[in-house]
Amino acid sequence: ALSLAVFLAGCHSTPSKMTATTAMDATSISQTAEKKGLKLAVQAYTQDQSDYQTRLYDLNQDGIDDAVVLLSGMEWCGSGGCTLLVFKGLANGSFQPHSKMTVSSTPIYALSTQTQGWRDLSVYTRGLGQVVLKFNGKSYPSNPSLATKYTANLKQVGNTLLLPISAE
């Protein structure tokens, strides 16, 4: 009876492992589809194959990752920084344009604070340093150089680094 119990216990553990593997594969497939949806959204927005840095993060607490996209290249960057896009993630894995900000650079943070249901962002803008971008009900402000300087500690609990400082 003991050998039968050990045999049955051994059989019981195998499906658990298969379930875990299946769940991991489903997550990988979901993430791949999400990345493809983001790539299509960025290409549709830029009308080309622009280079960019991106981070998926749920900015509006709806359980669906949104995308923060920092474009690069001569057509998207100037002396003050580059164009930053925020795309709202949709349940079907696609992304819709949400906000466009100019003169933005890294580091970019999602702050612990929120305005009208969206996390406040902090971006670096040349000449000012880190500034706070608050959602106004429709979008984030388009010109960070006109935003309020962020004076608190960026590394405080609740703030999330989305895009670290990059070599330009």
Each predicted region: which residue ranges?
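Repetitive beta-architecture junctions, highlighting loop-to-beta-strand starts
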Residues: 52, 82-84, 128
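Acidic, divalent-cation-chelating loop motifs in proteins
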Residues: 55-62, 111-112
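Short, flexible beta-strand-to-coil junctions
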Residues: 70-75, 88-91, 123-129
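Repeat-based blade/solenoid architectures
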Residues: 43-53, 100-110, 153-165
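Beta-propeller blade repeat segments, especially FG-GAP/WD-type strand-to-loop junctions
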Residues: 20-30, 34, 79-99, 132-140
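Acidic/hydrophobic-patterned starts of short beta strands in beta-sheet-rich repeat architectures
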Residues: 61-72, 115-123
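Short consensus segments that form the blades of beta-propeller domains
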Residues: 44-45, 74-79
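Acidic, small-residue rich beta-repeat scaffolds with periodic aromatic anchors
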Residues: 3-29, 109-168
